């Protein structure tokens, strides 16, 4: 049977090739210069279990902007869409005291009138890879200036837990040695909210996101009075390496 017309995406990546990545802005300047976003969570979740969550924010613009810069992060991982198009993935892996965020310019994908931001956020839970630090499931989208503040993450965002996903744990005996990567995944496609990144999607059964603390820039916050001198939450630092690429490659006929 011919596989003509079928495309495979090699996911080597963090951000789509040629995507609108902006200059990574130092955290202290970002979080002091704009209305503060809030870390948001799926209500009712413990924040530590395996879970795949969809976040959405519909908003309106009077005109198409020439620039619309935002800063994005999540725990464990996220994939961001604007009007149905993938725009960014991350964050770059690090630890809680140096939690990374990506800076992206959404302007090229925006239009006058209604727009929708959508984020897929997942937490591997107890089966997370050895290199993955985590505080709890969460998502953050921070405006770069007051003009982008309409999309700041907060209770205006909607969220849906995707119950179609389940982890497939991998143990050392099953691979013949030490295993430090994420689990496999099983997906029941009948329970997937197809079309959820687009404007025409109806948010039936979605909930208002629960909101927590605002963002904190690493090394600029007072240290908590605990034996380790650590501040609470995610201490944010700009991405330090270039994003990798995703390249579509077609099967041979």
Locations of regions flagged by a protein language model:
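Signal peptide processing junction and immediate N-terminal pro/mature segment
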Residues: 18-24
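Bacterial N-terminal signal peptides
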Residues: 7-17
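Beta-strand-rich ligand-recognition modules
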Residues: 79-136
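Short beta-strands within extracellular/lumenal beta-sheet-rich domains
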Residues: 49-61, 100-106
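Extracellular beta-rich ligand/substrate-recognition surface
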Residues: 43-53, 91-99
